[in-house]
A protein has these predicted regions:
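Short, conserved loop-to-beta-strand elements that form functional interface hotspots
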Residues: 23-35, 136-148, 170-177
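Intrinsic disorder/low-complexity detector
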Residues: 39-110, 161-184
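Short, well-ordered alpha-helical segments
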Residues: 1-28, 90, 95, 102-142
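Hydrophobic, ordered structural segments
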Residues: 4-58
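C-terminal functional regions that serve as terminal interaction/effector modules
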Residues: 132-135, 140-147, 153-171, 184
Length: 184
């Protein structure tokens, strides 16, 4: 599953590099399970490429690659004006399999598995951001699902954008951007 996700993101980055982009905003990773293909999953990565008008090297990752971010264009610009740039769209999950129990009481092993799955998924996402030389993760979304694949399973999925600080003395937005809706 991780190899398929990484391949989809790599292909999107390669296309952005071919276009001369500095990064990708609004990136989303769609995971589809097509009928007739059993347990196979299809990963599709889409996003909007952006390029700096000035020297865009500060917008690229420390490794010189195109950055990826699931932030909207507006959120990206706010982040940029605050002195940060995205590094990488981070995505981690963890699935804990459990034995079925037929009692109508709290299932301590299920409760503990839920806590463990969440903590492991978050730790993996943080480690992925650190490997990309980021200082934090913004726009984090955590989803939890329970499924039955022969056994009962609890799964946590964590998504976000890792960021790094750029120029310390860059101008920071003093007020939010306002668009006049009454203009003709």
């Amino acid at each position: 599953m991780y190899n398929a996700r990484e391949l989809a993101m790599f292909r999107m980055q390669a296309e952005a590099d071919a276009l001369g982009a500095d990064g990708i905003v609004g990136a989303r990773l769609e995971i589809q399970q097509n009928e007739g293909y059993g347990d196979l999953l299809d990963f599709v990565a889409v996003g909007t490429v952006v390029r700096a008008r000035e020297n865009g090297t500060a917008w690229r990752t420390p490794a010189g690659r195109t950055f990826t971010s699931d932030l909207s264009g507006q959120d990206f610009w706010k982040l940029r004006k605050a002195g940060y740039v995205p590094v990488q769209f981070v995505h981690q999950s963890f699935r804990q399999m459990l034995r079925q129990q037929g009692q109508n009481v709290e299932l301590p092993n299920f409760t503990q598995a839920t806590y463990d799955a969440r903590e492991i998924a978050m730790a993996r996402m943080q480690a992925e951001a650190e490997r990309a030389q980021a200082i934090g993760v913004v726009g984090v979304r955590v989803t939890e699902s329970t499924r039955v694949w022969g056994q009962h399973a609890v799964e946590f999925l964590c998504l976000g954008t890792s960021v790094r600080r750029v120029e310390e003395n860059e101008h920071v937005i003093a007020s939010p951007m306002v668009i006049n809706l009454d203009a003709t």
